[in-house]
UniProtKB/Swiss-Prot annotation:
Domain of life per record: Bacteria
Biological source species: Bacillus licheniformis (strain ATCC 14580 / DSM 13 / JCM 2505 / CCUG 7422 / NBRC 12200 / NCIMB 9375 / NCTC 10341 / NRRL NRS-1264 / Gibson 46)
Pfam families per the UniProt record, alphabetical: CinA, CinA_KH, MoCF_biosynth
Leader sequence segment: none
InterPro entries: CinA (IPR050101), CinA-like_C (IPR036653), CinA_C (IPR008136), CinA_KH (IPR041424), Competence-induced_CinA (IPR008135), MoaB/Mog-like_dom_sf (IPR036425), MoaB/Mog_dom (IPR001453)
Family: Belongs to the CinA family.
Bilayer-crossing regions: none
Protein name as catalogued: Putative competence-damage inducible protein
Length: 416
């Protein structure tokens, strides 16, 4: 079937309209469809009402040739996505034996009795390709009907995301009959804003064809998604590398990793590769930096420990800050940050100590405005350093930005 690649995503569920949950599914699906050259032109949310859902489907049929549904595949009476689509397209629902067996097995394994309405989850549109659900009960499906694709996916992201990546995406490519191999690579940057990055790369972004370059800013970071396509996989990778090299020639100092990595993960890798250990003394960040560094398995190889020194008394007893420093300069100061970093390094026997002291907000402290931050770094046999920042945003944003800058500073230090 010839597909014009005009897609629409319809999220089904009254909880979306009531603001009880955020529609992250539409974002996820749109991003993955863009990677394979399918353009999403419309996002629609509709409640659990068959008449309104019917109207939405009929509108989508007039403007889209690929209609994706998320939600409404459950066992309850208000889960009516399949039934409504079946009525609109004139296809009956039939029991999928494999899906039904999978549901029965689930209840046996969990020693629970299956309700009669769970059988409903194994019903599929006649003539559709079934998308197995490895993380739930309701299967998805892809139906070709009158020059359109209808894809039905479960609502919970933990079910939808693996189903889309592992089952739906390969099937879509097969249906499209494309010989081209589409590959994406995400470059991650920190310490540069989206507007500055786009300015530095303006000519490359304006001239993009293959690969395409898509910037995105989130949580104080900027990513560039490069997407290339070619029948020859080697040529696809060559196109990506050529564009990546041109980008990094200009803004490589801010680059820190690929795809789904994080600053904390890259810092953990750097510590491991250099055989260095780390400890942290945190005030207003409240252990956030330490929690990030210990999310990876085997964290004890590089992270010795830390202390949350919120009060001045603990800054003295847990990290060895002198009372004279606190009286003369205050807790929010470069001097305090240096002593915190040095003290925690010595107390834990680590190679590196890092500290965070500042004002998360919203109130001022010691005459400093909200967002004033000092990050201290102490490296064995080297002089301590302190870095001063003024961040904007909420209390949570200041804490996160500070912890990220701590990772960033240590990564840059290890590159020297």
């Amino acid at each position: 079937m010839k597909l014009e690649r005009k897609a629409e995503i319809i999220a089904v569920g009254s909880e979306l309209l009531l603001g009880q949950i955020v529609n992250t599914n539409a974002q996820f699906i749109s991003r993955h469809l863009a990677e394979i050259g399918i353009n999403v032109f419309y996002h629609t949310a509709v409640g659990d009402n068959p008449e309104r859902l019917k109207q939405v489907i009929q509108t989508a049929q007039q403007r889209s040739d690929f209609i994706i549904f998320s939600g409404g595949l459950g066992p309850t009476k208000d889960d009516l996505t399949k039934e409504t689509i079946a009525e609109v397209v004139g296809r009956p629902l039939k029991l999928d034996d494999e899906a039904f067996e999978s549901i029965q097995d689930y209840f046996k394994k969990t020693n629970r009795e299956m309700s009669p309405n769970n059988r409903k989850q194994a019903l599929i549109l006649e003539g559709s390709d079934v998308l197995p659900n490895r993380f739930g009960m309701a299967p998805g499906m892809l139906l070709e009907h009158e020059s359109r694709f209808y894809m039905l996916l479960p609502g919970p992201p933990k079910e939808l995301e693996p189903m889309f990546e592992n089952e739906a995406k390969p099937l879509i490519l097969e249906k499209l009959g494309s010989r081209e191999k589409i590959v994406s690579r995400v470059l991650r940057f920190f310490g540069i804003g989206e507007s500055q990055l786009e300015t530095d790369l303006e000519d490359l972004i304006d001239a993009q064809t293959n690969p395409t370059i898509a910037p995105l800013a989130a949580d104080g970071e900027v990513t560039l998604r490069l997407t290339a396509k070619h029948a020859d996989p080697e040529e696809t990778n060559r196109l990506l590398k050529e564009t990546e090299d041109r980008i990094l020639e200009r803004v490589g100092e801010f680059f820190y990793g690929y795809d789904d990595t994080s600053l904390a993960e890259e810092l953990a890798k750097a510590c491991r590769s250099k055989g260095m250990t780390l400890a942290a003394a945190e005030s207003f960040t409240g252990g956030l930096f330490s929690s990030w560094l210990t999310e990876m398995s085997g964290a004890s190889e590089y992270f010795k420990g830390g202390a949350v020194c919120y009060t001045n008394e603990l800054k003295v007893s847990a990290a060895g800050v002198s009372e004279d420093t606190l009286q003369r300069y205050g807790a929010v100061s470069a001097q305090c940050a240096k002593e915190l970093a040095a003290g925690i390094r010595v107390k834990t026997g680590s190679d590196i100590g890092i500290s965070f002291t500042g004002v998360a907000g919203p109130n001022t402290q010691e005459g400093h405005p909200a967002g004033k931050v000092f990050i201290g770094i102490s490296v064995k046999d080297q002089a301590e350093e302190a870095f001063e920042f003024q961040f904007a945003g909420s209390r949570s944003a200041v804490r996160k930005r500070s912890a990220k800058y701590g990772c960033h500073l240590l990564l840059k230090m290890m590159e020297k």
